[in-house]
């Protein structure tokens, strides 16, 4: 197994899941074109398309609610909240 840092390992794991399951979608603030604030999703939108890796509005409560709705409807969402301090507004969901 190749040695890699944490960012590369997360990117590889997400890529693997997107390849093996067409119901996996990734979304969050700047995760699409930009590749996330820490570049964890870099290149995934180019490889899998904007319908599976896409940006969300700056609304953590909305991100959580959308992820729950996707899950209830058979998708396997990976919702990214940029920083731990931003998760608190999502607790209302």
Feature annotation, model-predicted:
Residues 1-93:
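Thiamine diphosphate
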